[in-house]
């Protein structure tokens, strides 16, 4: 490990790996550090991602695909269900990954492109000069080293500390973070080609439960609830235990993971002087689903592309790096974040009675292709009692 690079990346998840690969392919010197001793572990993710979205970055490999999903099923509080086949669901169906293998594949590609990778190495402080981020103090393998860089990319996940140390407000209100628990269950009866989403305030208040197939009679079974609902006796693990006891009483637990995901609006700015913030660290996980793999990869690649140009011009100021912030906000991803935040805010306010009414009307809807706006228009037709609320939601999405 040298003490000076073009780009220093904090975190080796999908966002960091895409940034490292993109920059290294252009000949820049890149160091990516990961605080954990192994890439891809521990997994804190339901591991689902849309096929078309993923193909934008990497071709499918059976080594890291656990299941190829053909449909998505939504189940209302009273058990009413609606299924969307792949041709109608679009990015709501895709692959269930093996993140341990997938993350390592991405980092391997970054290393092959020329990026240096250091595991068991954490950033413990930024190097700041008159408010300009000039690198980071790294600690690993019993030593502490100051590493300077023209640009630092913070890709250190939902628990990101680095951007905060640099003066960026990264706080998430407790009601805008989902606290989650998940079991990897085996010996259970499931549709191995479908993801299933369960709604209901008794199941997962202000969140949802999921069943994501991982292979033969095996699935990730988990849920997320609003942080403000996380109370003694009603923690995510408590809700999950009740859900599993009801739906998979004979399932055998292979693994248990817990974690959190932000469902807020993105950071007010994802750049500063010498600093760029990507993925969950930038609070750009999907506020409706909590999904973050694609968004991390997209933002990581875009950040590197902008950083490359700024380094070539010799200007890595906030004003120069702002092109990254501006571009992702007007992208399809940025627009989806805005739209899905509004939809999330609508659904978390609904009672089980209203959720059931919506679920019942889903079954009457026949759309050629899944579209959020078309779905809401159809729901308005079938739910006159919810006319005002749904029209307000539709109008906000059109604004």
UniProtKB/Swiss-Prot annotation:
Protein task: Is involved in the reduction of 2,3-digeranylgeranylglycerophospholipids (unsaturated archaeols) into 2,3-diphytanylglycerophospholipids (saturated archaeols) in the biosynthesis of archaeal membrane lipids. Catalyzes the formation of archaetidic acid (2,3-di-O-phytanyl-sn-glyceryl phosphate) from 2,3-di-O-geranylgeranylglyceryl phosphate (DGGGP) via the hydrogenation of each double bond of the isoprenoid chains.
Entry similarity comment: Belongs to the geranylgeranyl reductase family. DGGGPL reductase subfamily.
GO cellular component: membrane
UniProt keyword list: FAD, Flavoprotein, Lipid biosynthesis, Lipid metabolism, Oxidoreductase, Phospholipid biosynthesis, Phospholipid metabolism
Miscellaneous: Reduction reaction proceeds via syn addition of hydrogen for double bonds.
Molecular function, one GO term: flavin adenine dinucleotide binding
SUPFAM superfamilies: FAD/NAD(P)-binding domain
Highest taxon above the source species: Archaea
Protein species of origin: Methanosphaerula palustris (strain ATCC BAA-1556 / DSM 19958 / E1-9c)
Coiled-coil intervals, chain numbering: none
Protein name: Digeranylgeranylglycerophospholipid reductase
Cofactor note text: Binds 1 FAD per subunit.
């Amino acid at each position: 490990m040298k003490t000076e690079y073009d780009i220093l990346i904090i975190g080796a998840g999908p966002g960091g790996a895409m940034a490292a690969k993109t920059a290294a392919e252009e000949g820049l010197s890149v160091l990516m550090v990961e605080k954990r001793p192994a890439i891809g572990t521990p997994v804190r993710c339901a591991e689902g991602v849309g096929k078309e979205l993923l193909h934008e970055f990497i071709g499918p490999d059976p080594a890291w695909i656990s299941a190829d999903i053909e449909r998505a099923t939504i189940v209302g509080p009273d058990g009413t269900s609606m299924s969307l086949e792949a041709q109608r669901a679009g990015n709501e169906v895709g692959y269930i990954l093996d993140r341990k293998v997938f993350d390592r594949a991405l980092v391997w590609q970054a290393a092959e492109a020329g990026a240096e990778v250091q595991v068991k190495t954490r950033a413990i402080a930024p190097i700041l000069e008159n408010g300009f981020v000039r690198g980071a103090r790294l600690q690993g393998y019993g030593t502490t080293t100051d590493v300077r860089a023209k640009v630092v990319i913070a890709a250190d996940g939902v628990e990101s500390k680095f951007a905060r140390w640099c003066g960026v407000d990264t706080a998430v209100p407790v009601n805008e973070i989902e606290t989650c628990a998940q079991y990897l269950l085996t010996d259970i009866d499931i549709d191995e080609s479908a993801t299933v989403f369960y709604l209901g305030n008794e199941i997962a208040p202000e969140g949802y439960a999921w069943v994501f197939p991982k292979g033969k009679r095996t699935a990730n079974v988990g849920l997320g609830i609003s942080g403000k609902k996380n109370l003694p006796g009603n923690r995510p693990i408590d809700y999950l235990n009740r859900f599993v006891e009801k739906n998979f009483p004979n399932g055998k637990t292979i693994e248990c993971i817990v974690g959190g995901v932000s469902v807020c609006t993105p950071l007010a700015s994802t750049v500063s002087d010498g600093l760029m913030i990507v993925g969950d660290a930038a609070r750009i996980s999907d506020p409706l689903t909590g999904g973050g793999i694609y968004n991390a990869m997209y933002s990581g690649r875009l950040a590197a592309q902008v950083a490359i140009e700024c380094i070539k011009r010799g200007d890595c100021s906030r004003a120069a790096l702002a092109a990254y912030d501006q571009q992702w906000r007007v992208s399809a991803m940025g627009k989806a974040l805005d739209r899905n935040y509004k939809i999330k805010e609508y659904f978390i306010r609904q009672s089980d009675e209203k959720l059931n009414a919506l679920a019942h009307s889903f079954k009457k809807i026949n759309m050629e292709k899944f579209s959020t706006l078309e779905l809401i228009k159809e729901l308005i037709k079938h739910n006159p009692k919810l006319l005002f609320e749904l029209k307000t939601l539709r109008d906000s999405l059109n604004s």
